[in-house]
UniProtKB/Swiss-Prot annotation:
Function: The beta subunit is responsible for the synthesis of L-tryptophan from indole and L-serine.
EC number(s) per entry: 4.2.1.20
Protein name: Tryptophan synthase beta chain
GO annotation (BP), single: L-tryptophan biosynthetic process
Coiled coil residues, start to end: none
Subunit text: Tetramer of two alpha and two beta chains.
């Protein structure tokens, strides 16, 4: 019986044998990691054709994660988007609260197949870290999570969740102290402990085979959404919309729709304070081709090729690179990418909360802001599907400060400091 949930990429839509999507991708890594990365590629190739692997992952996705995730129409929210019909793919309802669990369970099974006993991971908003710590608790694996020091403050609740699950959380104090630097430290750890450790990479970036493998574990999002839209709306959408940081939730939604030429694929990047200010993380909007974290893609860099520091109110989108398949979709014209400011995202977060009773993650709110814009362009005949990639519990301190929801300035934040002392915007 074919798998219901683990559906590797269809023939003809895979990267080259060297891991390239057109001019983007590849494997640019130190010699010390070549054997480990190649082992992941070989083991994944075996797993893709192993019915037992598919059966085990399917069982976890159904009975542990709670798939299929719901497809929810949001008419009161859509009324602010010119009346276009808008459906949300509810990855926020998954166990651990985001799409991240899809990839994590797949890679955790691979870790066991490879005989590794320790997992490391990077995390920005903490959702990938929480999902990784969850899977390690489930499978009895040692777990170390690297997280930028600024992000540990912004996402103190998720730090506590990871530690409750038994993970060691290391606050990275180098560089910008955000996601980019957490990835750097995780790679250093992997080099030093490669024999017993698997790096459970959390997005569709990094060296081959990670971009294609992580995408395959997330393809279930779009496969389900496509089927659900045909059942609930009677047709395919005019556009599939998702936020884009590294790009995993977006490619998970987009990929099932790539053969459907009439379905626009729209990624919403973090414009921060505005692309023109330089304080943003809109890599496809303002970046140039370069190499970062083991692959060639678009990168935010200066005239000398040095990586510039990204900024976003969203810890999960605060990254100066992008998955190579997104770079390929952009250059081929199949994908469209728009930049969404902090303010537009936060206004969309509040609007969904107050019209539909759903509090989204700030990451997902960037996609919601994009949907409002696209809906107004399409009008009442438009049909949109938006990937609601995560829930907003983790972002309540940021949102409360942004909108002035605390009763006094002396309110205590999740990490025990005064709310005004925590880094990030207040409004």
């Amino acid at each position: 019986m074919p798998s219901n949930f683990f559906i590797p990429d269809p023939e003809g839509q895979v990267p080259s044998a060297e891991g390239y999507f057109g001019a983007f991708g590849g494997k640019f890594i130190p010699e010390a990691l070549v054997a480990a990365v190649d082992e992941v590629a070989v083991e994944y190739d075996k797993a893709k054709s192993d019915p037992e692997f598919a059966r085990e992952l399917d069982d976890l996705l159904v009975h542990y994660t709670g798939r299929p995730s719901a497809l929810t129409e949001v008419p009161r929210f859509a009324a602010e988007a010119g009346g276009a019909r808008i459906f949300l793919k509810r990855e926020d309802l998954n166990h651990t609260g985001s799409h991240k669990i899809n990839n994590v369970l797949g890679q955790a099974l691979l870790t066991k197949r490879m005989g590794k006993t320790r997992v490391i991971a990077e995390t920005g908003a903490g959702q990938h870290g929480v999902a990784t710590a969850t899977a390690c608790a489930l499978f009895g694996l040692d777990c170390t999570i690297y997280m930028g020091e600024i992000d540990t403050r912004r996402q103190a609740l998720n730090v506590a969740r990871m530690r409750m699950l038994g993970a060691e959380v290391i606050a990275v104090k180098s560089g910008s102290r955000t996601l980019k630097d957490a990835i750097n430290e995780a790679f250093r750890d992997w080099v030093a402990n490669v024999d017993r450790t698997h790096y459970l990479f959390g997005t569709v970036a990094g060296p081959h085979p990670f971009p294609a493998m992580v995408r395959d574990f997330h393809r279930v999002i779009g496969v389900e959404a496509r089927r659900q839209l045909l059942e609930q709306a009677g047709r395919l959408p005019d556009a599939a919309i998702a936020c884009v940081g590294g790009g995993s939730n977006a490619i998970g939604l987009f990929h099932a729709f790539i053969p459907d030429a009439d379905v626009r694929l729209i990624g919403c990047e973090p414009a921060g304070h505005g692309v023109e200010t330089g304080e943003h993380a809109a890599t496809l909007t303002a970046g140039e081709p370069g190499i970062l974290h083991g692959s060639r893609s678009y990168v935010l860099q200066d005239d000398e090729g040095q990586i510039t520091e990204p900024y976003s109110i969203s810890a999960g989108l605060d990254y100066p690179g992008i998955g190579p398949e997104h770079a390929y979709l952009k250059d081929s014209g199949r994908g469209e990418y728009r930049a969404v400011t902090d303010d537009a995202a936060m206004q969309a977060l509040r609007l969904l909360s107050r019209t539909e009773g759903i509090i989204p993650a700030i990451e997902s709110a960037h996609a919601l802001a994009g949907a409002l814009e696209v809906g107004r362009e399409l009008g009442r005949d438009g049909l949109l599907v938006v990937n609601l990639s995560g829930r907003g519990d983790k972002d309540m301190d940021t949102a409360a400060r942004y909108f002035g929801l605390y009763d006094t300035d002396a309110e205590v934040a999740a990490d025990g400091t005064g709310a005004a002392e925590i880094e990030g915007d207040a409004k």
